[in-house]
UniProtKB/Swiss-Prot annotation:
UniProtKB keywords: Cytoplasm, Hydrolase, Protease, Serine protease
Protein name: ATP-dependent Clp protease proteolytic subunit
GO molecular function: ATP-dependent peptidase activity; ATPase binding; serine-type endopeptidase activity
Function of the molecule: Cleaves peptides in various proteins in a process that requires ATP hydrolysis. Has a chymotrypsin-like activity. Plays a major role in the degradation of misfolded proteins.
Classification of source organism: Bacteria, Pseudomonadati, Pseudomonadota, Alphaproteobacteria, Rhodobacterales
Family: Belongs to the peptidase S14 family.
Cell compartments where the protein resides: Cytoplasm
Any one cellular-component term (Gene Ontology): cytoplasm
Top-rank lineage group of the source organism: Bacteria
Annotated EC: 3.4.21.92
Length: 199
């Protein structure tokens, strides 16, 4: 997950758009959003605009397909929070890889609405950031990274049912999970092979 300490925001290691817009990294249709590629501010803005437009049109469930290596933490926060904010149910569907800020978006949905295709991998880890400037600035930035890490640990603990201490320990390094491991961990609700398996 990426964040930058003044945009430098804070960057993590390691898409969607309004109805009429389509691109290789962001394809949309009614009640469907595809988030693919790095999580950036621009992608987050388009995704949120699309989610809000769909929510205004209808209360029907929205399917969000996610395949991402991660990106900016704050951009992931933006999408995560709007998934919870809007009235329609959002079903997140992982494919290929759901990593870092992508995983943060993925757990914006309730556990029973988190799906993935069979060959999906998941990654969670601590945010990373380049710290620079004066000694005072570096202290401030380090404190912001600590607060972000604690907040993300709490989000994933609540999303998975794991103790915060377990999340903190597991994410000291890159923590990869296959589909069965993600199910056991509480990150994933169900593995599906067909759209017909969506409830």
């Amino acid at each position: 997950m990426t964040t930058s300490a003044a945009r430098k925001g804070l960057r993590t290691r390691g898409s969607a758009c309004p109805r009429a817009t389509r691109s290789a990294s962001s394809i949309s249709s009614r009640a469907q959003v595809i988030v693919a590629g790095p999580i950036t501010d621009k992608l987050a803005q388009r995704t949120v605009a699309h989610l809000l437009a769909l929510a205004e049109d209808s209360d029907e469930p929205i399917n969000m397909l996610i395949s991402s290596p991660g990106g900016h933490v704050e951009s992931g926060d933006m999408i995560h929070d709007v998934i919870k904010f809007i009235r329609p149910t959002v079903r997140t569907i992982g494919l290929a890889w759901v990593a870092s800020a992508g995983a943060l978006i993925f757990v914006g949905a309730d556990k029973e609405n988190r799906y993935c295709l069979p060959n999906t991998r998941f990654l969670i880890h601590q945010p990373s950031v380049g710290i620079g400037g004066t000694s005072t600035d570096m202290m401030i930035q380090a404190e912001q990274v600590r607060l972000m890490r604690d907040r993300l640990n709490q989000i994933f603990a609540e999303a998975t049912g794991q103790p915060v201490e377990r999340i903190e320990k597991d994410t000291q390094r890159d923590f990869w999970l296959n589909t069965q491991e993600a199910l056991d961990y509480g990150l994933l609700g169900k593995v599906i092979r067909s759209v017909d398996e969506l409830k």
